[in-house]
Amino acid sequence: MKVWMAILISILCWQSSVWAVCPAWSPARAQEEIFRLQQQIKQWDDDYWKEGKSEVEDGVYDQLSARLTQWQRCFVSEPRDVMMPPLNGAVMHPVAHTGVRKMADKNALSLWMRERSDLWVQPKVDGVAVTLVYRDGKLNKAISRGNGLKGEDWTQKVSLISAVPQTVSGPLANSTLQGEIFLQREGHIQQQMGGINARAKVAGLMMRQDDSDTLNSLGVFVWAWPDGPQLMTDRLKELATAGFTLTQRYTRAVKNADEVARVRNEWWKAKLPFVTDGVVVRGAKEPESRHWLPGQAEWLVAWKYQPVAQVAKVKAIQFAVGKSGKISVVASLAPVMLDDKKVQRVNIGSVRRWQEWDIAPGDQILVSLAGQGIPRIDDVVWRGAERTKPTPPENRFNSLTCYFASDVCQEQFISRLVWLGSKQVLGLDGIGEAGWRALHQTHRFEHIFSWLLLTPEQLQNTPGIAKSKSAQLWHRFNLARKQPFTRWVMAMGIPLTRAALNASDERSWSQLLFSTEQFWQQLPGTGSGRARQVIEWKENAQIKKLGSWLAAQQITGFEP
């Protein structure tokens, strides 16, 4: 009873999550969006099944198909089936292909395994499914999966694949096998290399009219022997003896979801001879083959890998002005999970880069993780029917603007505050962008150092600043007064690296003001261009005004 209750709760939670992400579209907009995506997926289906080619990555196809199903659940009573079968498959399978139900996560798998025994895990090889029929010890027929009941006659093609045994003996002499035709790989590491569009490549080779030598680049992984030996160990031994060695090599007994998770993680990182997209857990005990029907296999389930890249909906386009005045564009996303990391924002880059990408709210983009786990955009995989792009701010800012607050300077001014509070500058721990915005909104700073004048009472009464932290914040602000002169100059945005600034041995504001361009040019990593920037910086009226203000506050190095 508890198991069924847990399953029911999972279903209800899943349904709630689906409805929670329904787009806020009018019926007309929903109809148009669904129709456009339906047509695109139909075109991809036709390319895949009729011509053996694919213009889209397998993972993108799968995720956009799931997105279409989600939209249809929101606005239409009956979603379409994805992965349409070939229209001209006419050869009956001796035993139907059942397909495999997908488990959402480890918990769901654990529930499924709880009341079952004699379970085995296999890699979910990424290719195209096939039936191999042996009669009197010879390969009699090979049939594509099709709709599970009927498929294409692939006998001629499969007979040219050297990895498929053409003759067998013993219990296999008159047998029906089901498996996956895959692209042979040498040392494929799924974690690093991803899916490489393997499924579409295999389909392309099998659909071509010419009998190319490239068929020998294919292999076969047998995952089912309907009505075969009762013991899994006997099945594996007979298959290996006949030449289907991969099945025995990559089939392991498991008792619980923890063991499956360990094997799944091992194969995710290991060098394998094929591309995979997860694992399949199956019971050794199967019903008689006459009871096999598409979509009705209760003795096996799949636990797929999380995609290396995820399709994410763009919720909004936002613009940020950095401390140097450069405008950057950020896409706010509907949350997706990448390698256990929740991704809700991705940096697009400059305004020009954003315009080249042509991204608008409502579009679907492919996101992955670059080095150090930083989200990046790989592609725009779908653009909405109605696209409205925000207008970027005027490019009026540079490295010498917005030291003093104004309405037009809001974003660059905040960026300067965030920069000066960072560990490498003044080290104002405990305050980030949100805190600086709260302080500026309440106390209306005149310039980037106005926070030095805040009292403990003012900090305590600032909305958005916890009273328990206000005293600590005031203490850090007060300690900042004792920071070395070079730290304050960095806070003012001097266009030098810390190494160059330290090498200058400048210890006072007056000394710095009298330094020449030739002096700066001699510093490590500082050429003539950077030296001119330093001169422009120290002669800027806002910088001079800030220097005088810090002198009045008796900051070290600025005193007259």
Curated annotation (Swiss-Prot):
Q: Please list the coiled coil stretches.
A: none
Question: Which transformation does this protein catalyse, written as a reaction?
Answer: NAD(+) + (deoxyribonucleotide)n-3'-hydroxyl + 5'-phospho-(deoxyribonucleotide)m = (deoxyribonucleotide)n+m + AMP + beta-nicotinamide D-nucleotide
| Residues the record marks as active site | K124 (n6-amp-lysine intermediate)
Q: Which Gene3D superfamilies match?
A: DNA ligase/mRNA capping enzyme, Helix hairpin bin, Nucleic acid-binding proteins
Q: What is its EC number?
A: 6.5.1.2
Q: What UniProt keywords are attached to this protein's entry?
A: DNA damage, DNA repair, DNA replication, Ligase, NAD
Q: What is one Gene Ontology biological process annotated in the Swiss-Prot or TrEMBL record?
A: DNA replication
Which N-terminal residues, if any, form the signal peptide? Answer: none
Q: What does this protein do?
A: Catalyzes the formation of phosphodiester linkages between 5'-phosphoryl and 3'-hydroxyl groups in double-stranded DNA using NAD as a coenzyme and as the energy source for the reaction.
Spell out the protein name for this chain. Answer: DNA ligase B
Q: What is the lineage of its organism?
A: Bacteria, Pseudomonadati, Pseudomonadota, Gammaproteobacteria, Enterobacterales
